[in-house]
Amino acid sequence: MQKLLSLIIVALVLYNIAKLKISSDDNNATIIEQASVNNSANNENQVSINNDPPVSLNGNLFERTISKIVINALKTEEGKAFFENILQPLNKPIDTKDYTIPVHKDLITSLFKINTIGTGNVGPASCGHVVTVFYQISDMSNNLISEDTKTFTIGSGAVMLGLDNVIVGMNVGQAREAIIPAKYAASVGANNDNADSAYRVNVMLKSILPQNFINSNEVKIYDNEIAYRIPLLCGEKIAFNAKITRLANGEVLYDSKAKGQKVDMKIGDITYPLIFSYALQGKVPVGTRTVIAKGQTFKALGSNINKIISQESLPLNEYLMLEINDFK
């Protein structure tokens, strides 16, 4: 444990040093570039020095190697999300009254740089809902690529996987703006010259079906382990063990481990309990996630088929406990 903590602290220090160095070098590059432009009026062929300058690193070979890894990681969206989310828990005060970890709050918001506008009046949308949205997709220079009003199932990737995950958690009437990394915009990138570019997205939610919602204040979620990796997203496939227990008397209603067969599902599959997709989207696949919610959230979305538990036998108004782990 001590070695792990030391490694995390070293990573944090390197992260902050790298940010300071990159910021300093960018500022220096700007000053040098301006001076160069002023002194080269008679030389149109002078090479611009606005390229990324090499970062001067100090320390021994190991320290320089780690620093280079950190700096290269910071150039990617996934790397930025990784390091930013290491810092978040350390910068927050400990609240002994509430140890729950919001499912869709930190990692997803950071990954897609989501900004929500308005409050809306119906929702929130979960992975698996059928939604109608108006969206605009632009490149990073704000050149419009496409816009449309479309109806689709969240998790289907009908437009692009990143858009589906931005919509999760929205209410009807709300708008969001986000930046989608190229990895989660493959269908859009395939039609553009620069397939590795990120995209700006603006989306407004117009309707949700069916109107069967999970409100975060009615669900308690606990993780026994935290790891800073890219989280699971709506529309991805994952295998895991799941156990459902009736809190009133401890009766086990479902246990995949006892059955000897893991649950293998696409997040957003409406033939599985809605609470499964809700708990999985935004979860880093390590440890055990424990969810406490009413039985009605264990119903499958808009379907009489429930691959986990018979909907007729569900105690809708009782609290159940879901445990998911052994991710693969």
Swiss-Prot record:
Catalytic function, reaction form: [protein]-peptidylproline (omega=180) = [protein]-peptidylproline (omega=0)
Organism: Rickettsia bellii (strain RML369-C)
E.C. code: 5.2.1.8
Protein name: Putative peptidyl-prolyl cis-trans isomerase RBE_0327
Keywords, sorted A to Z: Isomerase, Rotamase
Single GO molecular function: peptidyl-prolyl cis-trans isomerase activity
Lineage of origin: Bacteria, Pseudomonadati, Pseudomonadota, Alphaproteobacteria, Rickettsiales
Pfam families: FKBP_C
InterPro entries, per database record: PPIase_dom_sf (IPR046357), PPIase_FKBP_dom (IPR001179)
Occurrences of domain PPIase FKBP-type (ranges): 128-225
GO biological process assignments: protein folding
Keyword field contains Iron: no
